[in-house]
Amino acid sequence: MIRTGLLLAAILATSLRADPFDDLRLKRYAMLTGGAGIDYSLPQIHARLSGIESSARGYWRTLQKDPGRETLWPDLASAASSAQITSAWSRLKAMALGWATPGQNLYGDSALVADIRSAAAWLEENRYNARVPREYDNWWDWEIGTPLQLGDLLVLLHGQLTPEETARYAAAIDRFDSDPRVMIVKTVSTGANRIWKCMGAVLRAIAVKDAANLQLASDSVDAVFPYVTSGDGFYQDGSFIQHGRHPYTGGYGSSFISQLADLLQLLAGSPWDVKDPARDNVYHWVFDSFQPLIYRGAMMDMVRGREVSRAGSSDHAAGHAAAAGIFRLSQLAPNGAAAQIQSMVKEWLVSDTSRDWASGIGLDEVMPVAHLLADNGIPARGEVPGSWIFAAMDRVVHRRPGWAFGIAMHSSRIYNFESINRENLHGWHTGDGMTYLYTSDLTQFSDGFWPTVDPQRLPGTTVLAGSMPRSNQVGGSPVAGGATVDGYSAAMMQLGPPGGQLNARKSWFLLDDAVVALGSDIGSSAPDQHVETIVENRLVSGDAAFTVAEDGKWACLGGNLGYFFPNGAGWKSARADRQGSWREINAGGSPAGITRRYQTIWFDHGAAPDGASYAYVLLPGKSAAAAAAYAAAPEVKIVENSSQAHAVAKAALGLRAVNFWTDAPKTSDGIWSDRIASVLVLEAGGAIQIAVADPTQANGGAIHIQIDRAAAGVMEKDNAISIDQMSPALRLTVNVANARGRTLKLKCATW
């Protein structure tokens, strides 16, 4: 029989005489168990409750109950693994959720709560307590992972634990998380780590009514709100960095925003409410950092770091987790921002047909989100076309109706990839210019892609075949970035991976209906290894058609993805089934084999090339007929693909774009620069726009630009731009000192 009210009523009755600590405890209890007003007939609620019960029963069934036990679960028997300690507390929390959550059959089960108490006592006695002399294995489990699980356990089992039990568990948390500002003994905590530690400290303080520690935890949140210019945190351009030099918006950044939302909502209205005025920056992060990177509910993998190697953490799972945190934030936002945020979340959820909308949403949020989806007064936002250069993390996003495109680079500022804790073991080339094309094929990167794709042939990359560089390595050049104007971009990367045997100059020009990829100056000092540039390596189903022109000028995959090769034949392709396992890329993954089919397209530059090049154009959404028509009359002109400059033009848009590769005077397509620069010129509607960026972020002076066009008057101008001449050619001095890769723009009227 399902009990739905007696225990909850008894717990909530205490609120009639509650102090602020009790209010916070009850609020957290409601966040975990769903709170009042749940519609148990809603399929999503029923599914969530069934999942809670199933999980709790599974752990309860396998729990070792013998008084002489040496472990709680057979698969968590190690006394040397900190991760197993966190996992054990996580399982006990899952069991406690089963006991504490109304609407399913374990609610209020006395035998279950007795076994939870007994197991928790064993775990405190034998693994995690205030008497442990020092942390071992992974600090994260001691200071973050376990405190978060144990803290929630104290909330869920309040009234079932004796004061002595509560004190012991709280003392264990305090032993390792007494000051959220510090981690690993004396390191200042930052980013997601700071927020996690604050939440752990808050939960402990609630349990033992420690006002001083609760105030410390609340005050410690303030440090994350200001924008940063180095290290961990959010940057003005929307980037998010964790672990010093890793792009992590969709990993640690997503955890950051979700945990922060929980924390702010929990403390709202209490004596410990977080009131720093800078907290309003979080609403800017939602639009500047997360909005560009979530496409139809999927968080782009290029900002998820080593999490891509986790079987249970797909791009859609990560996107929904971020959406849940962002929705919770919307309930704290000013009215105007709240409606905008909820419209955005609605778009992500309704456009993602690959996953149930309630996946990843807290039980207490299912009803509010259901109401949002049914509310015609808040429409789904729709697609947001645009281009974003995330200069602080060497990432680029381009979005057009029906598709989105991402570029993952690295430089002397940003690491190539992260592989710690035996995760992301094949991430060798994910930062070497890997490109991600998102279309209506929503599961392209979530259906076993990472364990089965050839890690030596990732789309967009130029690779020394067989090379396996170490993780946490910076590149040999500072050049990685680009410029953007009116939704179009030019991006560039000087590829010089660790090892020093390969070099390449790579550009992408991101247009209205195409992506132009150019490469030059490709060289290698390895005599026996071929160098390849990978155009595509796409997961396909069944016998998806791959049509190729006789002259090699164009190809089409699946009837809706075109490729144009300006130089005709000279590229290669193959279709093959590949097998892999999650264990191969993550030590904690399953060893079970997975097979997926791929269509691969690449250029083989041969062994030890010197000055090799490539050019291709991606045509998302184009059929074979449309690709053939494009090849017969290309809409984009490749003006230059040399060691000095890469340049393209599209007359129909009035767009010219040049990436300059040297600190020497150079003219390409009527645009002159004296320094390394990314430059776009857009002429339309009686105006000319010039966008300039320093992709090195190392130029402490200026870039001088000349455009073969006269201008009549200034309409808009960045303060860093000085106009030296308006006619007969437009001459500019662009001060890029401290611009940090930001695009600087000028808009003038034309004659």
Language model features: what each stretch is:
Residues 1-7:
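Sec-dependent signal peptide recognition
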Residues 9-17:
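Hydrophobic h-region of N-terminal signal peptides that target proteins for export
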Residues 18-44, 748-751:
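Intrinsically disordered, low-structural-confidence terminal and linker regions
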Residues 42-45, 57-311, 316:
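Aromatic-lined, polymer-binding surfaces characteristic
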Residues 263-689, 693-715, 724-726:
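Extended polysaccharide-engagement surfaces of secreted carbohydrate-active enzymes
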Residues 392, 562-564, 612-615, 729-751:
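C-terminal beta-strand-rich structural cap/linker in extracellular carbohydrate-active enzymes
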Residues 717-727, 731-735:
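Solvent-exposed serine/threonine-rich low-complexity stretches and specific carbohydrate-binding patches
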